[in-house]
């Protein structure tokens, strides 16, 4: 019992020290020049490329442990770092460096009748806590985006990716030092004990300004329930694709297969296909065949089973499941209204797509579906900050306060008002 208490006290002290160092680093970081931040990002990119072999070796340790534990193939895919992915990670850092610096950007400006000139300008949030699970690339993405937006960051990765994250973090710190920025601007929690997460959720004595969770439903639910600081919630990506009767069939087949099968383990992967009842005879069977030929397992509604009897029957839980695997639920709905009703009932409000040529259908879908990202005639796998031109994202926020959709450098800022006068006093 005493050992447990001592361990908890030790983690609390460690985390408070990390918070204090982050707070101290946030002040010079907030006023760092764009050139200095960009120099750090470029140095980080070079460090990752030159340290590729060390990162792969560290990742191999994590992969071996995951395979020994019998973790799912989709989990291992998210965990895997190879030369191609590491090169893409380094490229992502350079792309963030090329983004416009959001800090001190004038968002709006106006003059009052009394001559006061008012500006609303972007400012860093301060210290951001990022809690994530199996994706080691989040270490680089989150570190880069927080740095670019002038924020210090505390990163707490999952125990499954601890070795990979440490190797990447060492490259980030090398970049900070090379550019003359505080090495505590990007900190990685050095312990895997879950008590560290609990400590972060308290705000570490007011040092953390916002928490960003990246992971499964249980992690996000815990963060939302226990956090004493604001949260940018990144819920599961229970994404839907609706194929309207007006859809071009070849386009629909291409988009549906890509949305599901390009990478099944990411949050932008489609988990449910909805087909217009008016398209049963023309679209349903070709879509099912295309998915089956691509190696996708189908969980089918009763109506779909009548068309393709050999499929596995869907149960209610399937419509609520983010598979993150080569599995998709398929249902027939009564037109655009039925699709909207189904999405409203089961969606996580992440990303939905409509495939249609009828402008009225598209307009209704865009107006009535309440999700962060809506796509027309495009794959749900475009739900990504990099694809939006944001240079990557720290997550996809599914809430409605402050940030929604891809959380990039602009979403990691707040604002303040600068008011210029010439001696005005209030009557």
From Swiss-Prot:
GO terms under cellular component: cytoplasm
Pathway: Amino-acid biosynthesis; L-proline biosynthesis; L-glutamate 5-semialdehyde from L-glutamate: step 2/2
CDD domains: ALDH_F18-19_ProA-GPR
Species in which this protein is naturally found: Allorhizobium ampelinum (strain ATCC BAA-846 / DSM 112012 / S4) (Agrobacterium vitis (strain S4))
Main location: cytoplasm
Protein name: Gamma-glutamyl phosphate reductase
NCBIfam families the record matches: PRK00197.1 (NF001221), proA (TIGR00407)
SUPFAM superfamilies: ALDH-like
Catalytic reaction(s) noted: L-glutamate 5-semialdehyde + phosphate + NADP(+) = L-glutamyl 5-phosphate + NADPH + H(+)
Keywords annotated in UniProt: Amino-acid biosynthesis, Cytoplasm, NADP, Oxidoreductase, Proline biosynthesis
Record keyword ATP-binding present: no
PROSITE patterns registered for this protein in UniProt: PROA (PS01223)
Pfam families documented for this protein: Aldedh
Gene3D superfamilies linked: Aldehyde Dehydrogenase, Chain A, domain 1, Aldehyde Dehydrogenase, Chain A, domain 2
Gene encoding the protein: proA
Record-listed E.C. numbers: 1.2.1.41
Lineage, uppermost ranks: Bacteria, Pseudomonadati, Pseudomonadota, Alphaproteobacteria, Hyphomicrobiales
Molecular function as annotated in GO: glutamate-5-semialdehyde dehydrogenase activity; NADP binding
Family statement drawn from the similarity comment of this UniProt entry: Belongs to the gamma-glutamyl phosphate reductase family.
